[in-house]
Amino acid sequence: MPAFLEDISRFYGTGEKNREGQTLEEFLEAYDPYKYKNPSATTDTVVFSYRDRVEKDLKGLKVLLVKRSNHPSIGFWALPGGFANLRENLDDTARRELEEETGVEGIPVEQFACYGDYDRDPRARVITTAYMALTDEKNVKVKAGDDAADAAWCTVTCTEEAEKESPEWGVKQYVLRVDNEDRQIHTRALVEKKERKGLIRERKYRVIDGGVIAVDHAAIIVQAMELLRQRVEEVQ
């Protein structure tokens, strides 16, 4: 099979042959990328909006959600996102999917997490890279497109409900509330954050109850809000 890339000059290493006596060109010609099942890659973007300024307590913050028009999680609300094209960088995937599903374009996006539990999608093994963005609501217009049945700004709050401590782990539970009166969206999600103490801080966000928010997107939103709150505190 021909090489995936036209220019392979930066992959020669020392230029020696491998154990089978193959050059890089010969190795790539014989390589079968379909020998093993490959995971699919997607992006999901948490877009926050504010009016004039971002408050320290994130009061008045909104999140952009789309209503799914197809399976899985049909009828539920989700983050704008979708599958990466074969020759597309992930940052470009995030921007493209955001524009296709909501009409929002031209705003900076930042990669902040990866969600890869094997059972997060019934279609296939899907690993998603999470992005976040922040914009003044008056600077963007939202319009549902592609496979989104609807798109809307929803007020969003995140409060800590419970906390447990052990010598090795810290566990917190958050209540995420998402509302939009016009769309009759009033949902509550419960998300658990488990973090290992020490220099290597293994961290896991898990949805206990997602309400009408699709898949693990409530956990992604909570993680993004935590990060945004930290950034605001640093600036202010």
Region locations from a protein language model:
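N-terminal leader/linker segments that precede catalytic domains of diphosphate-processing enzymes
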Residues: 1-236
